[in-house]
Amino acid sequence: MIENHSTTRQELYSHLMRRVGVGCTLNELEKISKISYESLVDQILSPENPDSFQEDDFDRYFAHEGIDIWAGRWLYRIINGGHPLREKISIFWHQLFATAWFKSEHPNSLIHQLEMFRAVGLSDMKNILLSLSKDPAMLFWLDNNDNIDGEPNENYGRELMELFSMGVGNYTENDVKNAALAFTGWTFTQPIPLYPTGHYASNFKYEESRHNQDFKKFLGHSGNFNGEDVIDIIVHQPATANFICRHIYNFFVEDEAQVPAWNIVAPKNPEAIKDLTDSYHKSNGNITEILRTLFNSDWFKNSKFKHLKSPAELVGHTLKISGNLREIKPGILDYVSAITNMGQHLLNPPTVEGWHTGKEWIDGGTLNERVNFCLLYTSDAADERSSV
């Protein structure tokens, strides 16, 4: 119950809205404060009108589909859309399953991946990992298009376990080799060339003639496995529940140590991780149910000031409360540039590891960028500019 916490009702609701999206306006806060906290959580997880706004003006102002324009679409959606959590979870998966434009230079595949995260990001882990494993941007990013019988490429099989699901120390090199064999033949159709016809997406393609049909041993299981079998085994591992739930806690609740240190640094709140992993096992890895457990918990309600906003969160929150992105306009790319200047180039993370978060968002340069951006849109001078 709210009365058990040393915050007012509006403070608690504001905290929730900052974590599920980028905050809310005073009018929105007054409206949602009329219902119970548990009912608000239910509405956030299953909104009545998730697509109750139009984006047609993006096509009016921006004639092409570059990654910065789609970062702008994401920013507009999370501020104005009817399902901010869907947009927030898409960035969560983008951070965890980091895939960058700089290798492929093919924006449509990155756009397709972001839309895939929006579509499946609140479903279950098996569906999420299967969708990821069939995603052309990921297949190219981690070279699985070169993974064929007789010449296996272990890149995706390794990162699937190390960075995307289980974490370091929970599998063997033989597991990596057999996972790679299970994903042989998983590739994508060649997209239409960039010029002169423009950008076109590609699609998943399974080439049976390039798939290894041998008997395989993987994480204690044996069989003639394919990629889907490997994913089914992975999502039922206790290590996967712990790893994914710690990522969720780190993103929505409290900044943890950087991910490479997780195998030697214990979680800050083991009780919270246990609550989340229990929910993972009970719901077969359903992200919506895990988040329901998280948002309704006492430790979440008491987690104010424990999470340092990412650049995307900071810019989104500033624009939300100042009312500077209530309509689509050409200057939206300036906001995307501000996010990039603070150290987070959306759809173009620096490595497969994604971005280091928490305090590592801050250095001398990025701190100045943060302060200057917030002052630009929230100071008295900003009020004077808006009245001109």
Regions found by a protein language model. Name each.
Residues 3-9, 13-26, 237, 241, ...:
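Flexible, low-complexity segments enriched for small/polar residues
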Residues 28-110, 116:
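N-terminal accessory alpha/beta regions
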Residues 83, 87-102, 134-138, 182-186, ...:
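Glycine-rich, acidic and aromatic/proline-enriched surface loops and short helix-turn segments
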Residues 86-87, 123-126, 172, 241, ...:
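Loop/turn elements at helix/coil->beta-strand transitions in domains of secreted/extracellular proteins
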Residues 100-137:
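A conserved hydrophobic secondary-structure block that centers on an alpha-helix together
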Residues 136-191:
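Activity-critical C-terminal alpha-helical subdomain
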Residues 178-181, 185-226:
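Long, well-ordered, tryptophan-enriched scaffold segments
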Residues 377-388:
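Single conserved hydrophobic/aromatic residue that forms the stacking wall/gate
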